[in-house]
Amino acid sequence: MSEALQINKPTPSIAGEKTIRFDSKSDVRETIYAMKAGASVLIAEFYSNGMLLLKELHKHLSNRLPNKTFAEQRAYRAEYHKLSNQVLLEITAHQVEVHKAPKIGWIEKLYPDTPDFLLTFPQVQGLNSAWQWYKNGVSVPVLRNKIHPYYGTYFPTRFDHLILFDNWL
């Protein structure tokens, strides 16, 4: 029984009916309120503009939502997840379209037939982290060499159990 492999990759996004542009001249507060009203936000100029918007979104939600109990923390995380996934980055010719954006090799490898599309900012952050782990490798104490995990592959970040297993062997 041979089934076609399905590649685990972020699904390209579609801009909402109302999409606003966010650059260094944009008002952060107005942008956050537009996002709460359902607008998508396309990051322009610099990658750091997206980082700034997500940081300010965290601050805004921290001031507006209680974050003490488990239920409140879940509500906070759900709201942050919903709003942060309305922040979009344009991918053109397999590159993030803003200045000073990281070069992410996974974009070309995972989307060979789709050179131009949109991804949410958190998806791009995830692809960037995964690319760095793949490119630089991850040291696992019980192995002689680094591992280079592909996007979407689980690898342990705590190694206590692996060290115990190695000692047992």
What residues fall within each predicted segment?
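Generic local-structure boundary detector
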Residues: 52-53, 95-99, 151, 158-160, ...
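Conserved alpha-helix/loop element of class I SAM-dependent methyltransferases that forms part
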Residues: 134-137, 144, 155-169
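Short, aliphatic-rich beta-strand segments
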Residues: 145-151
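N-terminal auxiliary segments of SAM/dcSAM-dependent transferases
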Residues: 1-143
